[in-house]
Regions:
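Conserved small/polar residues in nucleotide/adenosyl-binding loops
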Residues: 183-188
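Helicase-associated low-complexity/disordered flanking segments
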Residues: 1-177
Length: 188
């Protein structure tokens, strides 16, 4: 039986080989975009992250607006039961389409998103503090957490925090191969 398995692997490649071939384009794109991400200021890095979120929101905005309209029609007293069933089916189909569009957009932006995540981790691993222009999120977080403080118009994030009575320090930079998990899960 081992001979047959060896022959199959010889002619068709192993599962690991197939997985590597599948993720190689992502890895090359991440490596290509990473230097431009690494060159950004902390605020520019944050802006790029927000731009990715906006791309997703814009990509599904029309479908989300359609769902709002359909739900409003569902609530009208004059809407018949048959019409409510048809509208509910439309909502379900539109929700499914939104999920598919989100997956499509996530696949498209994965290299840049991963490069942003990796470089953010690098900044925290290599610096005791990461300083950005404060926004409402930072102010709200600073009111509740001790790893961020506000000084003037700046939010200062510490790379360490208390957890379970222990002072923990961020010291991890993501490996380029970590998108393997995402692409592998998406394929199966």
């Amino acid at each position: 039986m081992e001979i047959v398995a060896s022959l199959i692997k010889l002619f068709f490649g192993s599962k690991a080989d197939k997985d590597r071939k599948q993720i190689e384009p992502y890895l090359q794109k991440i490596k290509a975009v990473y230097p431009s991400i690494e060159a950004l200021s902390n605020d520019e890095l944050r802006d790029r992250s927000e731009a990715l979120k906006k791309q997703i929101a814009d990509f599904i905005a029309r479908d989300e607006a359609d769902i709002v309209e359909l739900k409003a029609k569902l609530e009208l007293p004059e809407t018949s039961l048959e019409e409510k069933e048809r509208i509910s089916k439309q909502i379900d189909e539109t929700t499914k389409r939104i999920d598919e569009k989100i997956e499509e957009k996530l696949d498209e932006i994965l290299p840049e998103a991963f490069a942003i995540m990796k470089d953010t981790a690098r900044r925290f691993a290599q610096n005791d503090e990461v300083v950005v222009t404060a926004n409402d999120f930072d102010r709200d977080l600073a009111a509740e957490k001790d790893f961020v403080r506000i000084e003037g118009d700046k939010a200062i994030y510490a790379n360490h925090w208390m957890a379970g009575g222990n002072d923990l320090k961020w010291d991890m930079i993501h490996y380029d191969v970590q998108p393997v998990s995402y692409t592998h899960l998406r394929a199966h």
